[in-house]
């Protein structure tokens, strides 16, 4: 987190609406309305801060304030100049009639002290006479005395109020439509949810590194993109107040054009960073015109000329990992890189990476070497995460089911996981075509279609094995897909030797019809779905050994449906009292609730709040982050 963002947490923004009066010896303000904006919803340009003792003492500052709503800038308030959006425009006298004052005004104060200190040491603000002050003090004393019985009553009931039996559910806006029922809301829910609980212990968000955009403090860019000549922040703040440039050319002041008056004006001299595409382009960016004075038709031996431009760059800009020329010609045909740029071999061709592409969370080298040996200085940014092994990845890759860090540390202790060390080594896993890891029993039982061709051996009872022949690869399909009229095997083996439906049961009474195919009666109630409509496992008095029996429905379920997050039995008995091994050891796309024996489908655990009974902070944080991410409002 940036220093500005950290500092803003210690401030509250007070907005007052009323009349202010000034005289030679006093200033007072009659308040009509007051609004307090909580931290993290405003941004402050710390350069413009000035102290004031009108309300909050020396801890109060008046400065440029930017208000946000859902991370979108809604208004910019400039103080100490009053925000006169609702100015009545009338002159009014002070209460004693001696001083002329302005009309209704908005006043802004960014205060570090608590709300109760706003009027401390400023009793003269309202010009109260001493008698009135005495009366106020007397009323305060009477109030304290009257509060004693109430305090005793609350103290005696404090223990009762703090127990888990206290049900705050009626006070929450939660109306569930899906199983399970709403869990009770506790006093802990009144606090904030720490987003740090979303990340594994061996993965860092590198808080405090990078540059926070002034106009959007939630947006952090890597340090490598600060003052490089490109505006990465929407407000361009990453290219302002530069002390040193990463681009090849810089100057101390520049020309700005007034869009209304169509004239160029001189601004306060400051260091600006220019890329080569802004040199010799006919636009004077520097006050002294140096960006347009270095144009030559022929460059010297110690210079490099961009293709299609008259700009001559120093040779140090060649192959330095920074795209200075608009066409990138300064970074082409590189046999050797400078300044930490990276070379990799891809498809037998030398690929030169810009410095900004190294440790950016996206592997562009075949061996992923451009994302290794990174640190928080290089892997900083609101969309990146750093593994303990030095691998830089995108935050969206954390806890996504794929192992991106060595030893899979980015998938450890994620929300919805539990400790399975006792049997983790016994569970065999298969990497399927979608890049995710699945348990072998799940991958090779035909449940996951992306795993059909990834298994060396298919489940003998639950699946049909499509043979490998020619270009056709061996794969596992569900038994219910055999003889269903659809070719699932590449060679059509699943639709061969099938009994026509019209002949089903004529010569062999031990057959029955379902889903346009014949099924042997011996396969009824065996815990395997041979029919797509699952009718072969319904109306069963007994179930085969190893299968699951739904007593309320008289149907049999395959063993792998136990604790898979889907309630197949009408009473939900197949999903009750799930263990960690049953939930995560046998399934891959499941979520184990933190403090219950409930296992849910990971993509169904939030709707939109956590469906876990007795949901913990981690369960709620997971769903809160998911909702914000899906709505495009998550700050990375």
UniProtKB/Swiss-Prot annotation:
Record-linked CDD domains: LDLa
Membrane topology: Single-pass type II membrane protein
An example Gene Ontology CC term for this record: plasma membrane
Protein location: Cell membrane
GO biological-process terms attached to the record: single fertilization
Keywords: Cell membrane, Developmental protein, Disulfide bond, Fertilization, Glycoprotein, Membrane, Receptor, Repeat, Signal-anchor, Transmembrane, Transmembrane helix
InterPro entries: LDL_receptor-like_sf, LDLR-related, LDLR_class-A_CS, LDrepeatLR_classA_rpt
Glycosylation site residues: 202, 508, 614
Extracellular side, ranges: 152-636
Disulfide bonds: 213-233, 227-242, 245-273, 251-286, 280-295, 299-312, 306-325, 319-334, 337-365, 359-374, 379-392, 387-405, 399-414, 458-476, 466-489, 483-498, 504-518, 514-531, 525-540, 543-556, 550-569, 563-578
Primary localisation category: membrane
Disruption phenotype: RNAi-mediated knockdown results in sterility due to the loss of oocyte fertilization.
Cytoplasmic side: 1-130
Domain LDL-receptor class A: 205-243, 244-296, 298-335, 336-375, 378-415, 457-499, 503-541, 542-579
Transmembrane segments: 131-151
Function summary: Probable receptor which is required for the oocyte-to-zygote transition although its exact function is controversial. Seems to be required for fertilization probably by promoting the interaction or fusion between sperm and oocyte. Conversely, shown to be dispensable for fertilization but required for the formation of a continuous and cohesive eggshell chitin layer by maintaining a homogenous distribution of chitin synthase chs-1 at the unfertilized oocyte cell membrane.
Name listed for the protein in its UniProt record: LDL receptor repeat-containing protein egg-1
UniProt source species: Caenorhabditis briggsae
Lineage: Eukaryota, Metazoa, Ecdysozoa, Nematoda, Chromadorea
